[in-house]
Swiss-Prot record:
It comes from the Eukaryota. This is Punein. PROSITE patterns: BARWIN_3 (PS51174). GO terms for biological process: defense response to bacterium; defense response to fungus.
Amino acid sequence: YHYYNPEENHFCATWDASKP
């Protein structure tokens, strides 16, 4: 799962599929 990280201005990957 990937999500955008506005604090670091890039996309991040996570195992947590429940993350928005």
